[in-house]
A protein has these predicted regions:
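Secondary-structure transition motif
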Residues: 1-145
Length: 145
């Protein structure tokens, strides 16, 4: 099963989403020190004035998980979602390199985003343990407290 590889970009200085959709990666040209986001349409250069004021550390790239919430919204790293299993709680989506998977962090416990569950009289099936995107760690950090 494949999923689209795409990112969204948070500008930490301006505290807003960088005005580009579906960034696939951030590229640094080491010869000219120019930064650009690579998109399906080609490179999207970052203005030199932006580069001089923070460079790579200014941006947070958050990858699409390939999953949608109950409202059909895409779920990205950094999103805060409502967890419905084993109990209702808010959790942050993050990428875990050790398991090479997206996970949920709630109350300092890492949870899988999908679990196997058997409903009486039916075969076991994969089900999401989240319901909907509540916000994200940049604009709504209070949702995790």
């Amino acid at each position: 099963v494949s999923r689209p590889i795409k990112f969204r970009v948070w500008d930490k200085q301006k505290k807003e989403w960088f005005p580009i959709k579906n960034a696939m990666c951030l590229i640094l040209n080491t010869e000219s020190t120019d930064l650009c986001f690579m998109t399906k349409q080609g490179p999207y250069p970052i203005p030199q004035t932006v580069q001089e004021d923070g460079g790579l550390n200014r941006y947070v790239l958050e990858q699409f998980t390939g999953l949608l919430d109950s409202e059909g919204r895409e779920i990205y790293e950094g999103d805060i979602v409502s967890v419905i299993y084993p109990e209702y709680q808010a959790a942050k989506v993050f990428y875990c390199p050790h398991s090479a998977s997206f996970r949920l962090l709630s109350k300092n416990v890492a949870l899988p985003m999908i679990t196997m569950r058997t409903v009486e009289g039916q075969n076991a099936k994969l089900i999401p343990i989240f319901n909907e995107v509540l916000g994200n760690v940049h604009k709504n950090p209070e949702l995790l407290s």
